[in-house]
């Protein structure tokens, strides 16, 4: 009996003893635990290409290769850090975003995490044909960049402000907003509450013909601050906190405390006119998502009350900025899959479905029938 018990205990605890005793490259440490050594392996950075026959994938942080869906064999190389032209070089990339026309690639480097879904990084524009690199911006690290549908512009956020880079004008940079301030005003990027509760980061979008840009503005100036200590022994090491712990403060509203005041704004890229969209919203209401439809004059806006039991979908013209409600109804008071809304633009296989209807419409994911279903509204 004792032998059987010992055998069972050995089987149960031997993996734990092995893991706690030795990591892959030596004794178990804080660095090995937090550095990804024990993460599950997977396939990342796979992006289907326009030909429908192949896909691109980042390999070893240095190359973006093209492979065949049918055979899995490599058929080409889109980017090789060791084989570029010009003076600007990068030795390693953390990720990439292909332009819609696949002529350029945004290369992500020097990535730094902020919260669960947000990062800052230094991005470079890579010209596939010329094999040349150019920095997206010289003004500091960027957040949540987005290609325009025509592939000729890139929008991004830096320090709470929204910027636009025009590739056809020698990468000229336009600052759209100027009121961004840490722990006060954020343009085009979700605050902590929205990032955590609605699983969103980027809060701006281009319209289909790349003439307008819309974004959500978060005023968190009245949200209470939360502070937690920062120690030297954290990873990465904070030597400045060797003798006394430092502190990090950010806006964190507990139940009953004020949320950010949110509003929707548009920017006419040609005239540079900025407008506020007149969205009917409760004082403590949310705007979890905005997105342009395949019609460049229709901006979809999702709103929700703070109790999260009622949601509405509005459609607005980005220039007159008037809204009309096209869907209203009860919602689950929780977000089971955290995204529960699905705005579809003219891309991928959904483009064929929308074209087949020959009318304006959008897809909406909802639990209103007690089972998660996708609805098409027109």
Feature annotation, model-predicted:
Residues 69-72, 127-131, 167-170, 268-272, ...:
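Short loop/turn segments that connect beta-strands within beta-propeller blades
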Residues 46-53, 59, 96-104, 145-153, ...:
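Blade-terminus and WD-like Trp-Asp/Gly-His loop motifs, strongest in beta-propeller folds
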Residues 61-66, 115-122, 159-165, 222-228, ...:
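Structural motif
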Residues 30, 34-35, 77-89, 174-196, ...:
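Surface-exposed loop and turn segments in beta-propeller and other repeat-based domains
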Residues 116-164, 169-203:
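Asp-box/WD-like beta-propeller blade repeats and closely related beta-sheet repeat scaffolds
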Residues 110-115, 119-122, 176-204, 212-276:
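Predominantly five- to eight-bladed beta-propeller fold
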Residues 347-378:
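N-terminal low-complexity segments that are often proline-rich with Ser/Thr-Pro
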Residues 57-83, 113-114:
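Beta-propeller domains
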